[in-house]
Amino acid sequence: VDGNLPFGSAAELGLTGHHALFLGEWLAQPLYLVAPKPNDARAYFSLRDQLSLPQEQFNLLARGVELNHFYQTHQFCGKCGGKTEQKSDEWAVQCQVCGFRTYPVICPCVIVAVRRGSQILLANHMRHKGGMYTTLAGFVEVGETFEEAVHREIWEETQIEVKNLRYVGNQPWAFPNSQMVGFLADYAAGEIHVQPEEIYDAQWFDCEQPLPELPPHGTIARKLIEATLVLCQQDKNKS
């Protein structure tokens, strides 16, 4: 890097001597990741605070956060323990001793909005502070399809069975390295019995009534909830 950044020089931004990693382009300008050093006292924004950005911009930020996490956690070879070095031609590290090459780890996670007639299933998760209710989600296990993960996660967390799965979309989720894969599903059977280690409370909420605090706009969870509300309204208009 020549020391010049799209919106100022490295010296002007106090980044002289920092390693810059090329991430791609934004508005025809090169975009670099510059990770702060341990003694950096400047204030930084949380990635969660940027969820309202346009999807393309948020994804670029997520890429930077995920790559930074990858390089920080793969400084040594997982095969022989040797020191690794970053590859210049791709996002990867290679062991300087045995040559083993490692690529960024991406952990797929299914996230599902379940509908029962004019109701939507929402849960208050243990990991969330406060009263926010959101969709159910969980990591895909080894040797498992996305659809199998949907059925398993919903059953484990609420004892509810679902049917009629429909893929909606996905979202990079750099907290620290997930890929959220979103589905809509219909209720099939069962009564709610929450998994206490994961879920504080889960309820069926009437789509026509005020809902509790929801996940922020920009999240795939919010997109799934809003898609379910649209389906409920469409069915109401038909009746």
For each predicted feature, which ranges?
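Short acidic-glycine loop/turn motifs at beta-strand connectors
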Residues: 26-27, 116-118, 189
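Short acidic-hydrophobic surface loop/beta-edge motif
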Residues: 21-26, 93-95, 114, 172-173
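Active-site-adjacent beta-strand/loop module that shapes the phosphate/pyrophosphate-binding cleft
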Residues: 171-194
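Cys/His-rich short segments
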Residues: 63-115
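Nudix hydrolase/Nudix homology domain
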Residues: 1-74, 129-133, 195-239
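N-terminal strand-loop-strand
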Residues: 92-134, 161-162, 185
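The catalytic Nudix box helix
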Residues: 134-169, 183, 191
